A protein has these predicted regions:
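Non-catalytic signal-transmission and effector/linker regions of two-component phosphorelay proteins
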Residues: 1-14, 79, 84, 101, ...
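Short amphipathic alpha-helix used as the core "switch/output" element in two-component signaling
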Residues: 48, 69-84
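Active-site residues of response regulator receiver
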Residues: 61-62
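Hydrophobic/aromatic residues positioned on beta-strands within the core alpha/beta folds
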Residues: 89-92
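Conserved acidic carboxylate
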Residues: 17
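Charged docking surfaces used in two-component/phosphorelay signaling
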Residues: 24-32
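Conserved Asp/Asn-Gly motif in the active-site loop of CheY-like receiver
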Residues: 40-44, 70
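Short hydrophobic/Thr-rich beta-strand motif most characteristic of the beta2 strand and flanking loop
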Residues: 34-41, 49
């Protein structure tokens, strides 16, 4: 029997996503499994929440409109929130994009490609954040 590699640290998961339907889907799936969720509708809002609060992990879309995208959120976390460096999951509908491929290859951060199923999401969430 192997030990779970990631332990749940408690606290909410920060969900950074600009599409309301994806936010609703992710929030419902995570809350059904016992996670609490705080959402941010843009990368800028996500950075504000990260600056002010404590989170167990972050799930962020890579491509979002506005001044701050998911790659920039990822870079900010690496620099400013070392406790979250390995507790990030990226989501993207465009993993064929060369910038996205470079980010994923260089960072080793888990990425879930849209569209995805609840079980696929939860498998990555539990491996990355642990179970509540």
């Amino acid at each position: 029997m192997s030990l779970q590699s990631t332990m749940w640290t408690g606290g909410p998961i920060l969900l950074i996503e600009d599409e309301p339907s994806v936010i609703a889907f992710l929030r419902a799936a995570l809350e059904r499994r016992g996670y609490s969720v705080v959402n941010a509708g843009s990368g800028s809002e996500g950075l504000k929440r990260l600056s002010a609060g404590k989170f167990a992990g972050v799930i962020s879309d890579i491509r979002m409109p506005g001044k701050v995208n998911g790659a920039e959120v990822h870079a900010w976390i690496q620099k400013n929130r070392p406790e979250l460096r390995t507790r990030i999951i990226l989501i993207s509908g465009d993993t064929a994009n060369s910038e996205t491929q470079t980010l994923l290859a260089q960072s080793g951060t888990p990425c879930i490609e849209k569209p995805f199923r609840v079980q696929q999401l939860m498998s990555v969430v539990e491996k990355t954040f642990g179970k509540p």
